[in-house]
Swiss-Prot record:
Lineage of the organism: Bacteria, Bacillati, Bacillota, Bacilli, Bacillales
Keyword entries, A-Z: Isoprene biosynthesis, Nucleotidyltransferase, Transferase
Enzymatic class: transferase
Organism name: Bacillus cereus (strain ATCC 14579 / DSM 31 / CCUG 7414 / JCM 2152 / NBRC 15305 / NCIMB 9373 / NCTC 2599 / NRRL B-3711)
Protein name: 2-C-methyl-D-erythritol 4-phosphate cytidylyltransferase
Gene for this chain: ispD
SUPFAM superfamilies the UniProt entry points to: Nucleotide-diphospho-sugar transferases (SSF53448)
Described function: Catalyzes the formation of 4-diphosphocytidyl-2-C-methyl-D-erythritol from CTP and 2-C-methyl-D-erythritol 4-phosphate (MEP).
Pfam families: IspD
Length: 226
């Protein structure tokens, strides 16, 4: 069993929607509802903790009722950064040995990816899902190519990411003490010298970040319905 943590306090400035991007609609259903439904199907998911902006609590609670989200969702105060939100949520992750941390704006995560991440977390203590990078990657400085990066070893990391609660707490506390801000939770675990397992993600498991992503998400959903 695991608890799902969703840091949902961000404002999604790159989307330019003027509101939390998780409230934007894909096929007339909010992004966050699509995401929650993916985990509703997983019996191993004991509960869900969402770190939110307190002023958005009434709307989140309304969505839970309107779309009949049956799993228990606990809303807690988010932090200034995503990392702070996850740390806050960890304080409430009781009665389970493992947590999965997932971006609320990844509505197309599959049950297979969820299960694989959990299995790897149970094996290694920490795990991520990722897909091989398909584009050529170049290092650029001041508008000029400095280096072409070897692509064969590069992976684009997604969520969910899985952790033992004790390990992730240790990693977050260490980062907090050193004022270290990581790009994801796995980077905090790497920083304390622990191994992170990797499983195959999915190219459909996109993060809806820009208006273009929203169009792609609409297309994905149409394909799924066929």
């Amino acid at each position: 069993m695991y608890t799902l943590i969703i840091p949902a306090a961000g404002q999604g400035k790159r989307m330019g929607a003027g509101k939390n991007k998780l409230f934007l609609l894909i096929d007339e259903v909010p992004i966050i509802v699509h995401t929650l439904r993916a985990f509703e199907k997983d019996k191993a998911c004991k509960s869900i903790i969402m770190a939110i902006n307190e002023e958005e609590r009434p709307y989140f609670e309304e969505l839970m009722q309107k779309y009949q989200i049956e799993k228990h969702v606990q809303f807690i105060q988010g932090g200034a950064e995503r990392q702070d939100s996850v740390y806050n949520a960890l304080q409430y992750a009781s009665g389970v040995e493992y947590v999965l941390v997932h971006d609320g704006a990844r509505p197309f995560v599959t049950n297979k990816v969820i299960r694989d991440v959990l299995t790897a977390a149970e094996k290694y203590g920490a795990s991520i899902c990722a897909v091989p990078v398909k584009d050529t990657v170049k290092k650029v400085e001041q508008g000029v190519v400095v280096e072409t990066v070897e692509r064969s070893q590069l992976n684009a990391v997604q969520t969910p990411q899985g952790f033992s609660v004790s390990l992730l707490l240790e990693a977050h506390r260490s980062a907090k003490q050193s004022c270290f801000l990581g790009t994801d939770d796995a980077s905090l675990v790497e920083r304390v010298g622990k191994q992170v397992g990797v499983v195959e993600g999915s190219y459909y498991n996109i993060k809806v970040t820009t208006p273009e992503d929203l169009l792609i998400a609409e297309s994905f959903l149409r394909v799924q319905k066929k």
